[in-house]
């Protein structure tokens, strides 16, 4: 995966396979809660129970690229273990779009804007999760983008790329890879690492910004690159957050 920052003042591409992209604009939904800020902007709102007690994840997928039920269960369990939300709902919905083999971030944002139907209102915080065929336009010979957290309540998963990557790794399952990518991207929405959730102690990889220095942590940069997934995915273990990342979340309203 690869992390991408975009703002009025700068465009910054990180050399990794997870992505973060904050779109321009500050459109508001019907509850006046902004959902077009950069990833990490809503970290405290997602983690704590102060503004929103409930979280609603709207999973939108194209035909043939629906995420596995086990992966979504892993996501729900993770949200329950790291946030203070009272109710967690994940809804899946097939969307009909013009399929492409390569998607730019502009394409992804447009797909969300046309198809997203759940927004943050009253005590419910809404998260948008897109699952697409094809691949990212940011793929290179050395990097394969598996997912991108591109707005404060939005991330995209390139499901076809995940399937292809899993098929190329002996002993690896799609569920392990898929779950890892989703949890990693969701953690960027939670503001890790130093992306809206302040660090208790410094553990940000300064070479690969917004990632943890601990190579065994879920937020380590290398495990998000599809080209490097064979280093960890074959073990059939989803990487966990390390102590520093957990402490950061706890200090910002999580657990």
Which residues fall in each region the model found?
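Sec-exported extracytoplasmic/periplasmic mature domains
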Residues: 80-88, 187-195, 250-254
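Propeptide-to-catalytic entry region of secreted or membrane-anchored zinc metalloproteases
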Residues: 19-136
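Active-site-proximal segment of zinc-dependent metalloprotease catalytic domains
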Residues: 121-200
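Surface beta-loop-beta hairpin patches that serve as ligand-binding interfaces in beta-rich domains
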Residues: 238-255
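C-terminal motif of bacterial Sec signal peptides marking the signal peptidase cleavage site
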Residues: 14-17
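Sec-dependent signal peptide recognition
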Residues: 2-10
